[in-house]
């Protein structure tokens, strides 16, 4: 399953100039890294249903690797996958790839693609503000390869999370912080982060 997703992603990369991808801090996960990351999770053999969040899903490589891993666990029969992606260039590929995963998996896979800014769409919830959701959605598993870029300290994403932003913030650190917020108690999160800047 993952091989096909990687093949389609490589076609996208060849068609999209690096300058355009860099504008979004867009770097795609390799097949080996995606499988390694999905292999880090521990699954309760008694669980029949899991919820998964992939924020900044890109082409869906990490989601697909995670689904592929769940294929090996008989007890898990139902997967609820939420993917955030707001890059209009990659969204058609993400939709195509996740549709392919739905066709290939033997599990009941429910996919929700949120075409919104992952951070800004939840800042009211994160900051416990009026208008926010008092009980925001939490996930059993969070996986991610967030955008790699520094943002100005007055960028909307930085001002949306003042609790975690000091100085010149990195967007990937903000994504990881929101990922922890989205994680349910006893949940697990695996992210690719640059330790040099944290």
Question: Where would I find each of the regions flagged by the language model?
Answer:
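Class I S-adenosyl-L-methionine
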Residues: 1-75, 82-101, 122, 146
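S-adenosyl-L-methionine
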Residues: 98-130
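A short acidic, Gly/Pro-enriched loop at the edge of an enzyme's catalytic core
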Residues: 126-141
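Glycine-rich S-adenosyl-L-methionine
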Residues: 160-184
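Conserved small/polar residues in nucleotide/adenosyl-binding loops
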Residues: 196-198
